[in-house]
Amino acid sequence: MKLNEIRDNEGATKNRMRVGRGIGSGKGKTAGRGVKGQKARTGVAIKGFEGGQMPLHRRLPKRGFTNPGATDLNEVNIGRIQQAVDAGKLDPSAPVTVEALLAAGIVSRVRDGVKILGVGELSAKLTFQVARASKSAVAAIEKAGGSVTQSLAATDGAVASA
């Protein structure tokens, strides 16, 4: 046996049916599409139309809304801030503000401010001036000898465009 002698087993493949090639072919005239109507025509069917069945986008419940007044805060863990201090990206003597976090590359595209979360360890004594901080983050910061000032006004419109 040679590579050029290899072929499929008898009956393993079937020739494709060529439709619309005369009544003697078995798939002539309407070519298996039935008679007339939208589905007999060429082209794509209507988007979202499911043959009369209630379409998915109408079956699903209408719930909730998008709150236009919601604050979009970037979340940062204290462990990430400690890494930045250890790497020399954050100055421990200066207050930790949105501008400082942006400059250190910890956050990007800040909209309404930054929220500090309490995951990780913090050993540096830092002063935070941020929009929000979780209870666990405040406890960890104060345990390390630091302080937290929370105010949504801590971020002005100039930071949002940065």
Curated annotation (Swiss-Prot):
Which source organism?
Methylobacterium nodulans (strain LMG 21967 / CNCM I-2342 / ORS 2060)
The UniProt entry, under PROSITE patterns, shows:
RIBOSOMAL_L15
Q: Subunit structure, per the record?
A: Part of the 50S ribosomal subunit.
In the UniProt record, the signal sequence range is none
Keyword Flavoprotein on entry: no
Chain spans, region Disordered: 1-37
Q: What does this protein do?
A: Binds to the 23S rRNA.
The name under which this protein is listed is Large ribosomal subunit protein uL15
Q: Which GO terms describe its cellular component?
A: cytosolic large ribosomal subunit
What are the record keywords, sorted?
Ribonucleoprotein, Ribosomal protein, RNA-binding, rRNA-binding
Q: Which gene encodes it?
A: rplO
The record's family statement is:
Belongs to the universal ribosomal protein uL15 family.
Annotated Gly residues bias: 21-35
